[in-house]
Amino acid sequence: MLLWLTNFLSQHFHAFRVFNYLTFRSIVSALTALILVLSLSPRLIKYLVSLQVGQMVRNDGPQTHLKKSGTPTMGGVLIIVAIVISVLLWGDLSNRFIWVILLVTVAFSAIGWMDDYRKIIRKNSKGLSARSKYLLQSIIGALAAVYLYFSATTGAETALVIPFLKNVLPNLGLFYIVLAYFVIVGSSNAVNLTDGLDGLALMPTVMIGAALGVFAYTTRNHFFAQYLAIPYIPGAGEVVVFCSALVGAGLGFLWYNTYPAQVFMGDVGSLGLGAALGVTAVVVRQELVYFLMGGIFVAETLSVILQVGYFKLSGGKRIFRMAPLHHHFELKGWPEPKVIVRFWIITFILVLCGLATLKLR
């Protein structure tokens, strides 16, 4: 929004030309989101407390979680709002990638909001039925995938980047739609499953979001793309503004969400942020690298799938003490902060490995 104004002003005042630089707009986007969340979170927490919008804790979970009951939730609304405001202010609103990512993020957050709302109103931890939630996610994910496929202007936008292999970029054709759909929907649910401890999902989301911003920056530049043997995607650079806003908003919220959490982001935050990472990975053509960097999300999801499947096949036996995986380690006696920080460390290592794929080919 401000880019249109500064483009006009820069014709008369040279100082405004700095707003044309992607790096500058990305930095101020992150700072805007960070300041918004840091300054408004205390008021939001008080407001949620006054409304008695408290977390409902399941009785069959770890007993240490019972003390979390009543902690304000749905704070993820502020994360999403801060991201949207920052991107609308500092992004190029004529860029189609920006709008796709924003709309997917907001739509999945809306699903999360409905889920949180039902949990609070009905005073249970069930929320939306799994079928209803998945149906809504599928519609949005499929629409986004179809749009990205048919709006592609170059073959590079639908090519699959295979890590560590140089000049191997198979065009997916219509299979692109299937892959994009599963990445968006799967990512949303994976982050949601991981968001079971204070800050556990948020810090990995921030780290991966920053890394995807690096990929977006390199993909936008023809010279960088050619040198690194990755697809050149015109317009993908604006995604950096979104990633920066995500990082800023995430860090700001983490200030209040870190152990012991003063507020939870709820499904409105985790579903939206998960979808944001997924659709961003699709846009910058780094689905497989995202699978690597989001190893914690993958492990958490697989632990649930394996646990449920084995439980049904074995007649009640379990692989893990409890799923998702972070609960397994809690029941083994690991303190919650230890589980959180170790998962963060693993994600940091995986993100470095993901960034290394830019050069190791």
From Swiss-Prot:
It catalyses: UDP-N-acetyl-alpha-D-muramoyl-L-alanyl-gamma-D-glutamyl-meso-2,6-diaminopimeloyl-D-alanyl-D-alanine + di-trans,octa-cis-undecaprenyl phosphate = di-trans,octa-cis-undecaprenyl diphospho-N-acetyl-alpha-D-muramoyl-L-alanyl-D-glutamyl-meso-2,6-diaminopimeloyl-D-alanyl-D-alanine + UMP. Its cofactor is Mg(2+). Pathway: Cell wall biogenesis; peptidoglycan biosynthesis. Catalyzes the initial step of the lipid cycle reactions in the biosynthesis of the cell wall peptidoglycan: transfers peptidoglycan precursor phospho-MurNAc-pentapeptide from UDP-MurNAc-pentapeptide onto the lipid carrier undecaprenyl phosphate, yielding undecaprenyl-pyrophosphoryl-MurNAc-pentapeptide, known as lipid I. Disulfide bonds: none annotated. Belongs to the glycosyltransferase 4 family. MraY subfamily. It comes from Coxiella burnetii (strain RSA 331 / Henzerling II). Keywords: Cell cycle, Cell division, Cell inner membrane, Cell membrane, Cell shape, Cell wall biogenesis/degradation, Magnesium, Membrane, Metal-binding, Peptidoglycan synthesis, Transferase, Transmembrane, Transmembrane helix. GO terms for molecular function: metal ion binding; phospho-N-acetylmuramoyl-pentapeptide-transferase activity; UDP-N-acetylmuramoyl-L-alanyl-D-glutamyl-meso-2,6-diaminopimelyl-D-alanyl-D-alanine:undecaprenyl-phosphate transferase activity. One of its GO terms (cellular component) is plasma membrane. It is an enzyme of class 2 (transferase). Its EC number is 2.7.8.13. Pfam families: Glycos_transf_4, MraY_sig1. PANTHER family: PHOSPHO-N-ACETYLMURAMOYL-PENTAPEPTIDE-TRANSFERASE (PTHR22926), PHOSPHO-N-ACETYLMURAMOYL-PENTAPEPTIDE-TRANSFERASE HOMOLOG (PTHR22926:SF5). The chain crosses the membrane at residues 18-38, 73-93, 97-117, 135-155, 168-188, 196-216, 235-255, 263-283, 288-308, 338-358. Its main location: membrane. This is Phospho-N-acetylmuramoyl-pentapeptide-transferase.
